[in-house]
């Protein structure tokens, strides 16, 4: 049967799994404009799927350098926010992994991140490491980030041979590759980026339930207008980084020196 044997409404489902060659054969006798639009939509989708597969293959470059070794990707989220911990994730991908569309978490929609997070956490070996607000203020954000990464590695149930790290040197004694913009160049680092991002977002949503003044459920602790307005009106919480501006300057004034412990 050809496309002109079907109603236009039923064509979308019919062509959903067709490849390019099958489409050409299926639509060879078609003249209806609506049906041809369905064909073009599927052609475009195939092109996008092909491109995504190509990009995924390119992002396997570093992993393939260490074929036969246990490769771990490491990334962090939360270096820039005014509140909340910095979170690191260490990921060892499963054999035969195929997470098409995986990329730097910042480049993905919230829906896509959530979908990949569910798929990854059900399949890969991973561990989360955190450095607290107190540690960030004590050591600085760079050192706290390294601390979180070390903790993630130490919590892995499998010892890796190779660490692929997003722009960081950890001096673990293992083989390390520090990759600039690694979350867009390595699938292992990208996977760590996604898991860390979704994990931290959930954590900030929980903090928002306790302290709703700062819009943490939307800004993840970053200095948005609503967050800054909340700081000016209510002061700081124990979750705020006192070494970060403008909080550092705010706590020098008597009116903002008190840390709120719960909503009023």
Swiss-Prot record:
Protein EC: 3.1.26.4
Subcellular location: Cytoplasm
Sites where the protein binds a divalent metal cation: 75-76, 166
RNase H type-2 domain sequence ranges: 69-263
Reactions listed under catalytic activity: Endonucleolytic cleavage to 5'-phosphomonoester
One example of a Gene Ontology biological process annotation: mismatch repair
Main location, first listed in the record: cytoplasm
Keyword Hydrolase: yes
GO MF, any single term: RNA binding
Cofactor note: Manganese or magnesium. Binds 1 divalent metal ion per monomer in the absence of substrate. May bind a second metal ion after substrate binding.
Cofactor(s) needed for function: Mn(2+); Mg(2+)
Family: Belongs to the RNase HII family.
HAMAP family, alphabetized: RNase_HII_B
Protein's UniProt name: Ribonuclease HII
Gene: rnhB
